[in-house]
Amino acid sequence: QQPNSPVVVGVCEVENRGVLEDLVKTPLMLPHDYGVIHFDSPDKRGIDVGLLYKKKNFTPTSFSKHTLYIYNGKETKDVKIKVGDEADGAENNVNIDVKTKRIYTRDQLLVSGLLDGEEVHFIVNHWPSRSGGEKKSSPNREKAADLNKKIIDSLYAINPEAKIITMGDLNDGPYNKSVTRNLGAVGKREDVSTKGLFNPMYQMHREGMGTIAYRDAWDIFDQIIVSEPLARKTNDYSSLRYWKAGIYNPTFLQQNAGQWKGYPLRNSNGVPGYSDHFPVYVYLLKEQK
């Protein structure tokens, strides 16, 4: 409903590609001519990740999915599956294969392309849930962060000035170990080191903001984290630079009455809603020539 709709949209908990194809054909979205990138993931429930993009602004040059292998908290390995390869597995992230002890969860989607002529990399995430408790399940998200860091480091190895945006539902806050230590994202732009990551959601959390509420406590599981070349403080805007971030929580996305007033408006008791999470966004700036 905005006059300038998002150029790139990362989505989580998508049942299948058909859902996204239907979405971009709805009356409000059809005029914007969005493209769709999606892989089926091993998650049995069909809650995949995907990417929507405005074709006039972003041209994908490559995309792949990176499978997270978790074995009851044991080691993981990264398998990149290119376009056309089959997805593997068929269990959800709280079930364990009795033979292999593997916990099935979502893949991480890497999309590289030209954003208004400039190379940018997007990684869409939906890290393992907190099923079984935050502490007990934390190693699974730490492994997801390790995989994410491996992808990012590989992009930095090719180009130390790589412009990378990693985003999604991390099922952890900006302060959790998975984000701060395993992934290495910091909350102050001036503290971002070379080949580092800046997390604008850290300060939002400190200010009491949130994308998800549980037992009257807000947290920010939904995060957009940018690489140092994007976050670098400079007066040079001849190329894309991070400007600002926010949580999109207009009143129509909120419960408007009752015990959960102000919470995200989710499907409940047969009443349709939008989501139990508020979406987040970032703006990038670039001088027009």
Predicted regions: what is each one?
Residues Q1-N4, N16-M29, N57, K150-P160, ...:
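Sec-exported extracytoplasmic/periplasmic mature domains
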Residues N4-V8, P31-Y34, D116-V120, N159-K163:
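Loop/turn elements at helix/coil->beta-strand transitions in domains of secreted/extracellular proteins
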Residues V14, W127, D169-L170:
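Active-site metal-binding loops of divalent metal-dependent hydrolases
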Residues V14-G18, D22-E119:
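Structured beta-strand-rich core segments of catalytic domains in phosphoester-bond hydrolases
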Residues G18-D22, I47, N140-K143, L147-S154, ...:
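Extracytoplasmic/secreted proteins, especially bacterial periplasmic and envelope-associated proteins
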Residues G18-D22, R45-D48, S131-E134, G173-S178, ...:
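Extracytoplasmic/secreted cell-surface and envelope-processing proteins
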Residues I103, E142, D153-I164, D172-K289:
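Metal-dependent phosphoester-hydrolase catalytic domains
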Residues E118-N140:
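Active-site His/acidic residue clusters
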